[in-house]
Amino acid sequence: MPNFSYEDSFSHGSNAIVVGVDEVGYGSIAGPVVAAAVYIPDRNVECIPNIKDSKLLTPKKRDALYKELLSHTVCGTGLASIDEIEEHNILVASHMAMRRALENLNLQRIDLVLVDGSRELKSQWPSKSIINGDELSISIAAASIVAKVTRDNMMRELHDQYPEYHWNKNCGYGTAAHILALKQHGATPLHRKTFAPVKKCIISTKNQDK
């Protein structure tokens, strides 16, 4: 279970404001990448028990924790659009989303940012990257939940525009049903055309039209 050991080891003093950051949608083939930043005041987790990596939670439990996190922590979210993913790359876009999430936190100061992953996050705040951070740091685990639910809700809304791609179920990831729909209907403006499955479909469609 994630805990505060990383927050303790990297911060200086119990009054340090340590924020966890995580993103969701890195490997998706459609939709934006979404990040969340979470600060747990006074390390109060009694109201938000059993926080863990969002991938290890059932949707029902994740949604319940999401509501508690919004009520009992300081949260910020940010995203990078499909155009930004295509213009730069998914890593750069993910870090853009993370910085925006941090900027959207209602905090007067941030002493340290804990980031899930191995890459350094360049921002105005000092940061530490933690591999598998969502399994180790409770702040990052909380951020993973907020980011996941935020993006899932977003993809369910986008599903209404393009129901044939089943984004209400796959959230833009390359499931078999999504790939089949991509082959049958082609790519939408919300698909990441530089990603291999989408790029392959576009090339295949062009070859068939010749």
Swiss-Prot record:
The EC number(s) this enzyme carries: 3.1.26.4
Signal peptide region: none
Residues annotated as transmembrane: none
Pfam families in UniProt: RNase_HII
MF annotations from Gene Ontology: manganese ion binding; RNA binding; RNA-DNA hybrid ribonuclease activity
Binding site for a divalent metal cation: D22, E23, D116
GO process annotations (BP): DNA replication, removal of RNA primer; mismatch repair
InterPro entries registered for this protein in UniProt: RNase_HII, RNase_HII/HIII, RNase_HII/HIII_dom, RNaseH-like_sf, RNaseH_sf
Cofactor: Mn(2+); Mg(2+)
SUPFAM superfamilies: Ribonuclease H-like
Catalytic activity line of the entry: Endonucleolytic cleavage to 5'-phosphomonoester
Location of the RNase H type-2 domain: 16-207
PROSITE patterns (alphabetical): RNASE_H_2
Main location: cytoplasm
Bound cofactor: record note: Manganese or magnesium. Binds 1 divalent metal ion per monomer in the absence of substrate. May bind a second metal ion after substrate binding.
Domain of life: Bacteria
Functional description taken from the UniProt entry: Endonuclease that specifically degrades the RNA of RNA-DNA hybrids.
Name of the molecule in the record: Ribonuclease HII
Gene assigned in the entry: rnhB
